[in-house]
Amino acid sequence: MSLKLNIQRWLFSTNAKDIAVLYFIFALFSAMIGTGLSAIIRLELANTGSPFLHGNTQAFNVVITAHAILMIFFFVMPALVGGFGNYLMPLMLGASDMAFARLNNISFWLLVPSLILILTSALVEAGAGTGWTVYFPLAGIQSHSGPAVDLAIFSLHLSGFSSLLGAINFITTFINMRTIGMKYENVPLFAWAVLFTAILLLLSLPVLAAGLTMGIFDRNFNTSFFEYAGGGDAVLYQHLFYWWNHPEVYILIIPGFGIISHAVSAIASKPVFGVQGMIYAMWSIGLLGFCVWSHHMFAVGLDSDTRAYFTSATMVIAVPTSIKIFSWLATLYGGTIRLNVTALFALGFIFLFTIGGLTGVVLANSALDIPFHDSYYVVAHFHYVLSMGAVFSIFCGWYLWSPKILGLHYNERLSHIHFWLMFIGVNVTFFPMHFLGLQGMPRRINDYPDAFIGWNQVASLGSIISIVASIVFIYVVYDQLTNGLHQGNKALDSQFKPSFMGTNLNVEGYTGPTLEWTVSTPPSLHAFNTPAVLY
């Protein structure tokens, strides 16, 4: 293919599948940088006395800020919503493409300058050491006088605008592009998950944009929205930020719920238990996500009755979440379970996400949250939900659908090695953090008393294991793309190809009840030029 055609295909692409591939590549690139930054954090905390950054606390704060923003905005969201959402949602609905194809293109390309801005913000002057929450007055002009915070805020603006355009696209596609005969109750769970994610993005992102814009004005135009001296209030920023932030954590995990539902159905060889209950549970989680934002703010001095309300409302979210957990377990019960790597990641997700949810119930209590606030207990909680929830669902989705997407099989044995290294690594990293938090170790501080050294060293060891697991995954994908046997010529190739690591033929072919399994492998660029008809 000529250079001109390549540029037309990949730079000016209006095809959802090509854009999804771009999202996957972008997410992998961002994840590699974000993982490198997490390695710096764990090297710094591997011992007392700031062994890696030599006491440069600002540099440490810049690293944790960049790590969080990269992992959330440039890894998990592009992979789950941009990658799997763009590729699978039109296929599951029987649509030829997304509703707004060119809007889809700009949604992706806005992320590239956004990533450049956030990386630049970490490199100019002293960097943006605000934490990813960008709290004022720490993010104000007195504390961060250079352009770093402005660059970080513009990065979040661009990323948010990209997500907003994508959300409009997904909602329109879901409502208008379903194929003939596909009623709402026939829509697969992953497509529902992407719809709810898009609705949450649409309702929450404008509020974040407002808060960040006020921050830009405070920094550069002498307003005082968050400045006490001028009659402003820094707590207002927290309300605006967390109004977006709490739905955001569900934006990160709800597409994962959709993927796990499909994976559990695949490995148990039976339909998901209680599909309508699953849909209502996701809707309830999304709706309740807007009613609990101040549980992040128990330590700022809320009234006791306000704290009582937010404690109760937060605990209510455990109900629809547990409906999902028990429905997955009920799906597995009595099924013919195939313990392939998709199954391992799905079961790992259910187990570890449940642990993260239980620590969330602990933190929902305002009386308990005040001592736990900003301690490593909170870090352990949200990493169990994200590092082992969202990220495990991404791996699970890759191992479930990549043979269909690429038409190439991955090496089953290597992928098992990836799972076990990852499972051990993340648990060894984050489980000790519960103990550190209970002992009172504060987060975002780059040194600590000698009493905390034991569990910190264990956590740093775990992070090394996780990094090795990530390298193994990159090799699995490389091996899949170079040695993965095409489904078309699979029968012709010798089943006993001599290879130390085994053959890529161990993968069991899976076909499911949803429309994406009915098209060719790999799917053509416009899989449904003629609408599929469901009876």
Curated annotation (Swiss-Prot):
It catalyses: 4 Fe(II)-[cytochrome c] + O2 + 8 H(+)(in) = 4 Fe(III)-[cytochrome c] + 2 H2O + 4 H(+)(out). Heme a3 binds at residue 381. Its EC number is 7.1.1.9. Its cofactor is heme; Cu cation. O2 binds at residue 250. Component of the cytochrome c oxidase, the last enzyme in the mitochondrial electron transport chain which drives oxidative phosphorylation. The respiratory chain contains 3 multisubunit complexes succinate dehydrogenase (complex II, CII), ubiquinol-cytochrome c oxidoreductase (cytochrome b-c1 complex, complex III, CIII) and cytochrome c oxidase (complex IV, CIV), that cooperate to transfer electrons derived from NADH and succinate to molecular oxygen, creating an electrochemical gradient over the inner membrane that drives transmembrane transport and the ATP synthase. It is a multi-pass membrane protein. Fe(II)-heme a binds at residues 67, 383. This is Cytochrome c oxidase subunit 1. Ca(2+) binds at residues 44, 49. It is an enzyme of class 7 (translocase). It comes from Yarrowia lipolytica (strain CLIB 122 / E 150). Cu cation binds at residues 246, 295-296. PROSITE patterns: COX1. Pathway: Energy metabolism; oxidative phosphorylation. Binds 2 heme A groups non-covalently per subunit. Binds a copper B center. The chain crosses the membrane at residues 21-43, 63-85, 106-128, 153-175, 188-210, 242-264, 271-293, 308-330, 342-364, 379-401, 414-436, 456-478. Its main location: mitochondrion. There is a cross-link at residues 246-250 (1'-histidyl-3'-tyrosine (His-Tyr)). It comes from the Eukaryota. Keywords: Calcium, Copper, Electron transport, Heme, Iron, Magnesium, Membrane, Metal-binding, Mitochondrion, Mitochondrion inner membrane, Respiratory chain, Translocase, Transmembrane, Transmembrane helix, Transport. GO terms for cellular component: mitochondrial inner membrane; respiratory chain complex IV. PANTHER family: CYTOCHROME C OXIDASE SUBUNIT 1 (PTHR10422:SF18).
